[in-house]
């Protein structure tokens, strides 16, 4: 195998990109911000906390209305007719965008893959679950070039079936159907992805040019190439890696390092990663017919293009004249026949480095005959591979896996079926959210919980259990802390975590510093004993799970705290949670859910550089809270005195443990002056303006509700004399929301 890395410059010297290309991304100038554009508040005060992220994706922007129920609409879909229609689209070439080999399988597989492949484990963002590929920036990423055509090809399907199928489900399913029509047996498919109607709020990177890498690697050298968290891609505008190698250097082993890291950040191990690349490249091709600059991306294209981008000036601009990535690689020469040809070709040839007609680095079979059919009937081609394809052979670990599959293709098919299913569904959360008859058996990566196999507790049982909990000797603080630790692990991004399963008693959650393991060790045995006593004596087959009891105990404590402040209120409780086992819990997978900061508990893990108040908003976002809900919850939890480690920061009340609006009243008291502590970092002291005596201490998590103008406006409402009842009601409503965040069984129909 030969290589020549003396010239790694992009083929288009006038491009604003940082490197040559990705698997299907054109060489185009990066969009430039409009000069002298009006400044926004973010421009004037970039360090100010932006709470608007908590109000994205609200019902005002949803044309279907707040009462639309996708599960009910989907239930009316004729799935078999729908499947036939999708396959017909795949197998019917259109003159306006001719299909390679008369079949769109490769294009649709890439569309589905790139929709799902944005998922990243650290914050659960990305993935195919919301149809985000329709919106900027994803619809205009270099890596998604010409996927606008794939979605337009599917428009007749969406138009025909309407609201019975979401764009998110259609985009994901199209790749599944493409594989099945080729003869591949998939592991199944689940529907249930609901569309969003505006771009999701997500930091994709800080680079200001397409294909930039400098910010996410922070200038690290090749000996210590570490991708910053939470990013899942090596390069701005790419799904995973640059297929020409890191920063366009065509080194298969260096590329393998990037592949392993980025796929790992999508929760894929080495075998799953290899399977996805081998299987995903069994059908289709890349497109780099000529060294030309294509037109602007969809978001920057002229209005008459109607949302289509990357107009190609070469020849016909499509078919064999298509320029998408600048790479011109045909893996197996088919879009309609599943086979093991990818590995047979990869291992059946020696490879030498060359360049595509567009000037992109790729490999060509050395001294090989032209045996690969042309997609439009032209002369046959020599076998070609991407740099990242050769990584599957040259990397010792990937090579061991793929060599085995060369001789045992049935093992590769099984591995790919499982990995593809995981790829398509990783961001959908628990299996209770899945719809349709093609759902596969639960896997551990879905964080399974047992089905309910007993009668649930009734109102009388609930009242009795509340009494037992409150008489157990456990304090309001212990009960609230435990319930919060259990439920607040939820992430609305990928629907993981939450109270269902009671995994707060299992590894790794019971050992997380933020959950105060020593306190859990005191509380959980007492609750387990109450559970066991009830289950042993209850009639009619009724039982209560520990997951339910933890939430019920926290709710009982909130009711007591409200009563101690003079308010009678019922905290709604919905039984139906079950208890997961340690065997159903992947410790490594759950480790990424550990909170780095939880402003609601005034907790921050050492070493965090982001300002704590911004991390508070991030936590609220993951809990699917609005700004008023975040405000009410934090203010209530402060007066309940449930800070991490018993800290008194922000406990602005003389009656800790009683649910009152004291936090807001005292925060906004102009008789208190705040200054940073001279003794303790990141702590503020509130002193009486007249005497200078310290009245309170606080962190930025607390003071932001008086400093930020938006949050202060909300805090003022809760501090009003006529809002005492409202505060308690709003706190309880927000508390119940957090406790039920993962109860998808309550809201499907």
Curated annotation (Swiss-Prot):
Please tell me which positions the record assigns to the cross-link Tryptophyl-tyrosyl-methioninium (Trp-Tyr) (with M-266).
113-240
Active site at 114 (proton acceptor)
On cofactor binding, the record's note says:
Binds 1 heme b (iron(II)-protoporphyrin IX) group per dimer.
Instruction: Give the sites of the cross-link named Tryptophyl-tyrosyl-methioninium (Tyr-Met) (with W-113).
Output: 240-266
Q: Does the keyword Lipid biosynthesis apply?
A: no
Pfam families referenced in this protein's UniProt entry, alphabetically: peroxidase (PF00141)
Matching entries from InterPro entries are given as: Catalase_peroxidase, Haem_peroxidase, Haem_peroxidase_sf, Peroxidases_AS, Peroxidases_heam-ligand_BS
EC no. given is 1.11.1.21
Any single GO molecular-function term of the entry would be: metal ion binding
Q: Which UniProt keywords apply?
A: Heme, Hydrogen peroxide, Iron, Metal-binding, Oxidoreductase, Peroxidase
Question: Catalyses which reaction?
Answer: H2O2 + AH2 = A + 2 H2O; 2 H2O2 = O2 + 2 H2O
Q: What class does this enzyme belong to in the EC scheme?
A: oxidoreductase
Q: Name one GO biological process term.
A: cellular response to hydrogen peroxide
Q: Where is this site: Transition state stabilizer?
A: 110
- How is this chain modified after translation? Formation of the three residue Trp-Tyr-Met cross-link is important for the catalase, but not the peroxidase activity of the enzyme.
Enumerate the PANTHER family for this protein: CATALASE-PEROXIDASE, HYDROPEROXIDASE I, BIFUNCTIONAL CATALASE-PEROXIDASE
Q: How does it assemble?
A: Homodimer or homotetramer.
* Protein name per its UniProtKB record: Catalase-peroxidase
Species this chain originates from:
Mycobacterium sp. (strain KMS)
Gene giving rise to this polypeptide? katG
């Amino acid at each position: 195998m030969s290589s020549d890395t003396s010239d790694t410059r992009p083929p288009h010297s006038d491009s604003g990109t940082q490197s040559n290309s990705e698997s299907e991304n054109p060489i185009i100038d990066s969009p430039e911000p409009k000069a002298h554009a009006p400044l926004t508040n973010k421009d004037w005060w970039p360090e100010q906390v932006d709470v608007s992220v908590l109000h994205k994706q609200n019902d005002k922007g949803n044309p279907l209305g707040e009462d639309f129920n996708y599960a009910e609409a989907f239930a009316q879909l004729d799935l078999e007719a729908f499947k036939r229609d999708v396959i017909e689209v795949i197998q019917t070439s259109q003159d306006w965008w001719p299909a390679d080999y008369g079949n769109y399988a490769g294009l649709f597989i890439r569309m589905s893959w790139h929709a799902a492949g944005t998922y990243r484990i650290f914050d659960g963002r990305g993935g195919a679950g919301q149809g985000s590929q329709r919106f900027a920036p994803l619809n205009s990423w270099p890596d998604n070039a010409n996927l606008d055509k794939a979605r337009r090809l599917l428009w007749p399907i969406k138009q025909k079936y309407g609201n019975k199928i979401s764009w998110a489900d259609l985009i994901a399913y199209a790749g599944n159907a493409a594989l099945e029509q080729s003869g591949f047996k998939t592991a199944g498919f689940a529907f249930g992805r609901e569309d969003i109607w505006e771009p999701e709020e997500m930091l994709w990177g800080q680079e200001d040019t397409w294909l930039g890498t400098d910010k996410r690697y922070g200038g690290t050298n090749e000996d210590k190439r570490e991708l910053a968290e939470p990013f899942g891609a090596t390069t701005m505008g790419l799904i995973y890696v640059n297929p020409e190698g890191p920063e366009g250097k065509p080194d298969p082993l260096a590329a393998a390092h990037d592949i392993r890291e980025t796929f790992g950040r999508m929760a894929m191990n080495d075998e799953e990663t290899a399977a996805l690349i081998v299987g995903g490249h069994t059908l289709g091709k890349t497109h780099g017919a000529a060294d030309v600059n294509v037109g602007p991306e969809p978001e920057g294209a002229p209005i008459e293009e109607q949302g289509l981008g990357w107009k190609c000036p070469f020849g016909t601009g499509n078919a064999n004249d298509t320029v998408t990535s600048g790479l011109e690689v045909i893996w197996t020469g088919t879009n309609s026949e599943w086979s093991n040809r990818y590995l047979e070709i990869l291992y059946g040839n020696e490879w030498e480095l060359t360049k595509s007609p567009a000037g992109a680095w790729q490999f060509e079979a050395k001294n090989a005959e032209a045996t690969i059919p042309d997609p439009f009937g032209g002369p046959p081609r020599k076998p070609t591979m991407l740099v990242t394809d050769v990584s599957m052979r040259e990397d010792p670990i990937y090579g061991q896996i793929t060599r085995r599959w060369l001789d045992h293709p049935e093992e590769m098919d099984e591995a790919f079926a499982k990995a593809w299913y995981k790829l398509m569904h990783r961001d959908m959360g628990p299996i209770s959210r899945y719809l349709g008859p093609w759902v596969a058996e639960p896997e551990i990566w879905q964080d399974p919980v047992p089905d309910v196999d007993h009668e649930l507790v009734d109102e009388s049982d609930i009242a009795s259990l509340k009494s037992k909990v409150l008489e157990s000797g456990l304090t309001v603080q212990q009960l609230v802390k435990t319930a919060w630790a259990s439920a607040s692990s939820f992430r609305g991004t990928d629907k993981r975590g939450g109270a269902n399963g009671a995994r707060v008693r299992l590894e790794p959650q019971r050992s997380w510093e933020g959950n105060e393991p020593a306190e859990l060790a005191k509380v959980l045995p007492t609750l387990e004993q109450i559970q066991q006593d009830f289950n042993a004596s209850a009639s009619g087959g009724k039982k209560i799970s520990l997951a339910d009891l933890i939430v019920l105990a926290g709710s009982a404590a909130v009711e007591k705290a409200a009563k101690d402040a003079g308010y009678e209120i019922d905290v709604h409780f919905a039984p139906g949670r079950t208890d997961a086992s340690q065997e159903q819990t992947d410790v490594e997978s759950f480790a990424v859910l550990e909170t780095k900061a939880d402003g609601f508990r005034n907790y921050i893990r050492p070493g965090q550089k982001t300002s704590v108040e911004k991390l508070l908003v991030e936590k609220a976002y993951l809990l699917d809270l609005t700004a008023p809900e975040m405000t009410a919850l934090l203010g209530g939890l402060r007066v309940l005195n449930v800070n991490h480690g018993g800290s008194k920061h922000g406990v602005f009340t003389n009656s800790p443990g009683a649910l009152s609006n004291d936090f807001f009243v005292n925060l906004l008291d102009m008789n208190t002056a705040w200054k940073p502590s001279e003794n303790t970092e990141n702590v503020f002291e509130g002193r009486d303006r007249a005497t200078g005596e310290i009245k309170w201490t606080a962190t930025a998590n607390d003071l932001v509700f008086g400093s930020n103008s938006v949050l202060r406006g909300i805090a003022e409402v809760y501090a009003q004399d006529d809002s005492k009842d409202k505060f308690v009601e709003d706190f309880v409503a927000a508390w119940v929301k957090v406790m039920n965040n993962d109860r998808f069984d309550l809201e499907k129909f």
